Regions:
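Extended, composition-driven regions rather than compact fold-specific motifs
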Residues: 1-286
């Protein structure tokens, strides 16, 4: 079966916003809410939309923001321009613009602010702090015609996984495999949605795995699922290297069609600011 995914292209814009509140969802996860007039037309229609978030230089605290030149982002030629890609967790209109929720994982901080500028900023973020967000460039909807949705995600992919659940039709069966650092992250899974409603994961059948228990658990959990149905769609995202065997199993052993599977390496251990558009497995690109 071929799934249709609606797609929309957006005009790229760099938007300034300021922190209005923060909420620690778990010891290692913080929700940062930004607001501003420039967010009023921010598009965020798809479950896995992503935008570039520009942070202050960790050495100086100065924000070296990009500017738009002929429809393209141009970073400043002087100063350090720091950016990372994030999925917008939620966007809400306000009387004078909009609010944007971002959920940031505080990992890599043991090596200092220079090694983890986004996490270090998020850990200390306070009301009035300024950021610049650019994008998303496009949005793709939930595939039409699916009857079962299987999601595999670590902490970095949970905002997108939550959006998948929220946007999937109510008659779609949702199965989730979560690859979590440890049991402290359970608080993030169970946290209320940004609008104050229940956690979207309450709707799904959720298996929680903990990396402290050893490697290989995600692949084993995926192999235990019955994925034979033609109306099943599988989306997986997280640390790139750990997802390579998952993708190989889904695409080659099971033989699921390209249109039925998406596996996205949001980050890669030992690599700074990995471009998630790069092939997950360079030896076997789609």
């Amino acid at each position: 079966m071929t799934f249709e995914r609606s797609g929309t292209r957006h005009d790229l814009a760099a938007r300034h916003a300021r922190v209005v509140r923060t909420l620690r969802l778990a010891p290692s996860v913080v929700r940062v809410t930004l607001a501003g007039a420039e967010l009023a037309d921010l598009p965020a229609g798809g479950p896995e939309d992503h935008m570039k978030v520009f942070f202050p230089d960790p050495a100086t605290g100065e924000l070296h923001a990009p500017r738009m030149v002929e429809g393209a982002l141009q970073r400043p030629t002087s100063g350090v321009s720091v950016s990372r890609d994030y999925t917008p967790r939620a966007v809400r209109p306000t009387a004078d613009g909009a609010e944007l929720d971002l959920e940031l994982v505080l990992h890599g901080m043991d090596d200092g602010a220079a090694a983890a500028p986004a996490a270090s900023w998020a850990a200390a973020a306070s009301e009035g702090d300024e950021l610049v967000v650019a994008g998303p460039r496009g949005s793709r909807g939930v595939p039409a015609g699916i009857e079962r949705l299987v999601l595999v995600a670590d902490e970095t992919a949970m905002p997108a996984a939550a959006r998948w659940i929220e946007q999937a039709p109510h008659d779609v069966e949702v199965t989730v495999i979560l690859d979590l650092a440890d049991e402290e992250v359970d608080a993030y899974v169970d946290a209320p949605a940004p609008d104050g409603g229940p956690s979207p994961f309450e709707r799904a059948s959720v298996e929680r795995l903990y990396r402290i228990d050893g490697p290989g658990q995600v692949e084993e959990a995926v192999r235990s699922l019955d994925l034979s149905g033609e109306t099943t769609y599988v989306w997986a995202a997280g640390e790139a290297t750990s997802l390579i065997p998952v993708r190989r199993y889904l695409r080659h052993e099971l033989g699921l069609a390209h249109e039925q599977v998406k596996v996205d390496g949001y980050w890669k251990r030992g690599v700074t600011n990995r471009d998630h558009h790069e092939p997950l497995d360079p030896s076997d690109p789609d």
